[in-house]
């Protein structure tokens, strides 16, 4: 398993080098090839882990004396999230080969070596972060994802794109200071950077380590007060918005917080309390910011901020003893990644074909572009938690856990009621836009829509299927 894990981690970086020095006309082909090879290695790793009865393995790769600097953790959670980030990386790379062409009506632009190279580096960095068994390893890949996000958000090189990229880099880097604090404190208290050593922390050191990780998580996952970068990051090409801002980069914060909870053991309840309060505030504020949005990608960005808030709320609940909340939150990472990626790529399909992503200009999509129309419907129902789509099987465990804990912690009851109201209101708002955009007589922009390339259609079909079955995959794997 060690060799498979290392190969999965290193292949995207090797691919980025190959893409960088290849002729531009071959960049997309090399990008897809290395993303596919990485996916095959990832699936082989998961198969080997399954055949070993899913017994967790921790491997130290770099150490100085007894100090673990870098290592790998292969367990049910890391392999599940690895599947998400690598498989979606492949889908986004395939989608990009159709989207980044001169036939794109919104952005007629052929994909370059730079695009595919940074996308591959990002896939590798996400694999490295998910598999890291030390805080130092997490920190390294945390920073690499930040650098890649700057390069990819600014890809079109407009003034607005460059400002948005710099804003994302600065805010997420401010968040990373929390991870530096956590790593330094962990080392000073335990003599190692291993995540497993967090269970040995006592006294004030616990607050510094877990508080630092939570602060870093807020920055990377666009939670209040560091949410401002994500809506502006929609200047990126839409496949990048789908991968970075729905499936991978924004999940980094949630994942490192979840990993700390899994490995930490005795976490101060004040960390859980602060996490819940800030998550609740983010969810409610994010919903209010839905209301004025007419740009489909900005609407989805604010939706992502609220959905990430749900994940932080569930993880914070788990600190008070709810195993159901922990597993529900991890499943939420998986299910939201597929459903929201679908939604973003539907937005990309509409902008490619119609030349706009402004919702008031889109009508009658189902008549002219049936596949994006179906995708819009499935994604809207999935992210708002309607059965039988995957989002329902993420939200329901969090509601069950929250109401169960409210018997012991009465303050949770009004919080859960507020979350129920937000959930229903969010459903109503997306159904409102669905009714305006998908059925009816096609608007001028939609009536004149160009056909979608086969690569884009293929990815939309796969994501529609995954929006139905990913919850089954997550629940089965975590058992």
Curated annotation (Swiss-Prot):
The chain crosses the membrane at residues 3-23, 30-50, 55-75, 80-100, 117-137, 168-188, 208-228, 238-258, 270-290, 300-320, 330-350, 369-389, 390-410, 411-431, 458-478. InterPro entries: ND/Mrp_TM, NU5C-like, Proton_antipo_N. Its EC number is 1.-.-.-. The keyword Zinc-finger does not apply. NCBIfam families: PRK06525.1 (NF005097). Pfam families: Proton_antipo_M, Proton_antipo_N. Belongs to the complex I subunit 5 family. This is Hydrogenase-4 component D. GO terms for biological process: anaerobic electron transport chain; anaerobic respiration; ATP synthesis coupled electron transport; electron transport coupled proton transport; formate oxidation; glucose catabolic process. It comes from Escherichia coli (strain K12). It is found in: Cell inner membrane. It is a multi-pass membrane protein. The keyword Membrane applies. GO terms for cellular component: formate dehydrogenase complex; membrane; plasma membrane.
């Amino acid at each position: 398993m060690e060799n498979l894990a290392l190969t999965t981690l290193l292949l995207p970086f090797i691919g980025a080098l190959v893409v960088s020095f290849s002729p531009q006309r071959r960049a997309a082909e090399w990008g897809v090839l290395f993303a596919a090879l990485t996916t095959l290695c990832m699936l082989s790793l998961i198969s080997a882990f399954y055949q070993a009865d899913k017994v967790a393995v921790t491997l130290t790769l770099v150490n100085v004396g007894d100090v673990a600097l870098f290592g790998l953790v292969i367990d049910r959670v890391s392999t599940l999230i690895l599947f998400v980030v690598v498989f979606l990386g492949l889908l986004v790379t395939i989608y990009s080969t159709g989207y980044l062409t001169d036939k794109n009506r919104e952005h007629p632009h052929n994909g370059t070596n730079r695009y595919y190279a940074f996308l591959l580096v990002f896939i590798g960095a996400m694999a490295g972060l998910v598999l890291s068994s030390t805080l130092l390893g997490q920190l390294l890949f945390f920073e690499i994802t930040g650098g890649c996000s700057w390069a990819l958000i600014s890809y079109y090189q407009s003034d607005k794109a460059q400002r948005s990229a710099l804003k994302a880099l600065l805010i997420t880097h401010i968040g990373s200071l929390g991870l530096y604090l956590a790593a330094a404190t962990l080392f000073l208290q335990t003599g190692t950077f291993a995540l497993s050593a967090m269970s040995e922390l006592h006294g004030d050191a616990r607050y510094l380590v877990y508080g630092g990780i939570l602060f870093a998580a807020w920055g990377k996952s666009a939670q209040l007060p560091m949410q401002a970068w994500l809506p502006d990051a929609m200047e990126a090409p839409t496949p990048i918005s789908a991968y970075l801002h729905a499936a991978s980069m924004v999940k980094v914060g949630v994942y490192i917080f979840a990993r700390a909870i899994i490995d930490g053991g005795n976490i101060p309840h004040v960390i859980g309390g602060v996490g819940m309060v800030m998550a609740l505030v983010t969810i409610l504020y994010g919903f209010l910011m839905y209301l004025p949005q007419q740009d489909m990608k900005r609407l989805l960005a604010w939706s992502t901020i609220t959905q990430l808030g749900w994940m932080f709320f569930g993880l914070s609940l788990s600190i008070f003893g709810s195993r159901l909340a922990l597993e529900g939150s991890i499943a939420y990472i998986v299910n939201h990644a597929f459903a929201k990626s679908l939604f973003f790529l539907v937005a990309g399909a509409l902008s490619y074909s119609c030349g706009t992503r402004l919702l008031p200009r889109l009508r009658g999509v189902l008549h002219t572009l049936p596949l994006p129309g179906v995708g819009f419907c499935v994604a809207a129902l999935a992210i708002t938690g309607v059965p039988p789509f995957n989002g329902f099987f993420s939200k329901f465990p969090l509601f069950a856990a929250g109401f169960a804990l409210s018997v012991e912690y009465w303050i949770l009851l009004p919080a859960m009621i507020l979350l129920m109201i937000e959930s229903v209101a969010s459903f109503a708002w997306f159904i409102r836009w669905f009714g305006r955009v998908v059925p009816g007589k096609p608007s001028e922009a939609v009536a004149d829509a160009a056909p979608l390339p086969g690569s884009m259609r293929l990815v939309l079909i796969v994501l529609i299927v995954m929006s139905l079955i990913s919850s089954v995959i997550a629940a089965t794997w975590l058992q």
